[in-house]
Amino acid sequence: MTTDKIEYRKRAAFINRQEELNFLKNYVDEEPETFLFLHGPKSSGKTTLLYKVLNQIEEEQKTDVKFLNLRKIFTEFPEDYNYKDFLRLLFNVGEEKKGKLTGEINVGFFKINTEIEKKIYQGRVDPFKVIEKEFIKLHQKGIKPILIIDELQALDKIYMNNGRDRRLIIELFNFFVAMTKEDHLAYIIIASSDGYFLNTVYNDSKLKKCSKFYKVDYLPKEDVMEWLLNLEKYSKIKDYTLTKPDAEKIWETVGGSMWEIQDILSEMFGKPLDEVLQLYKKKMRSLIVAYVVKPEQKKIERLLRHFVDRDELPMEEINSEDEKLLRDMVRQNIIYFDPTEAAYYPQGKSYHHGIRLYFKR
């Protein structure tokens, strides 16, 4: 549903990203030979970027896109979701045409008939073969199949048919290799902010030869300044404007994190900028305090202290005990781990502020 005719006092902005858009377009313009991992810190704009580039690509060439946003979908499932839950989100029962698969797949799922559905759940039909047939059919029609999975790590603990011998994620990777490197049938794009999950893939010798990694980072300063000094153009904000010093203050507080900038702009409808930023910094400090106060407090403080005067912590500077603590910080989105650099970073400027303020107490 389009919302272009609805008036809002602030809209979500999309700023530049031309380099990233060009990279993704070039990926889809070449014959599929590798599957692509989009990685980067939380809220760096990976999902928004994918939606944007897909809209542009669909206007220029024939594509058939399946976009599985697992972060969104699995909120509907219980914590102990299993293989059958995955099948339910992957396949939809569509029109039946003489017992064969229909080809109208435009909503992010693969449509199948009831007979195929029954055989899949009985284990008599390999679901990956069903998807492969659909890719072949599209390929023969001159249509490019594009499969995008956002936050793939949500499937990391699922086993096939509830057994403990075949992990679903491994079978998916084998399928991705077959569809790209071996058969050149489809484009596979995986987006994730879980650096540890991606590190497993990045250091797997087999998968490393079949995949590409591309980092989507926060916006650079010049793009943030362009946005904040032209709020009506990019965010449709008419209620207030920002001066260059105002924009500098926002940059120094949250950097290029678009989600956090949007949040600050929303708060400014009711409060002056300095008050908004002061409250924001206090909030970030309180998040660090809430995380640190636990039995391992002294050990956590020792690790976080690394970031008071520096931006990164290389993996070679830590030991196995440190790694366990840092792993939890990554999962709680306090720290970001970059698998391509083997280094830890605060989860953006705002968390960096929170860490520094914590040690100023």
Predicted regions and their residues:
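Conserved small helical "lid"/interfacial subdomain of P-loop NTPases
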Residues: 211-246, 250-255, 259, 264
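Conserved nucleotide-binding/hydrolysis micro-motifs of P-loop NTPases
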Residues: 72-75, 154, 194-198, 220-224, ...
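A short, basic N-terminal segment
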Residues: 1-41, 55-61, 70-73, 196, ...
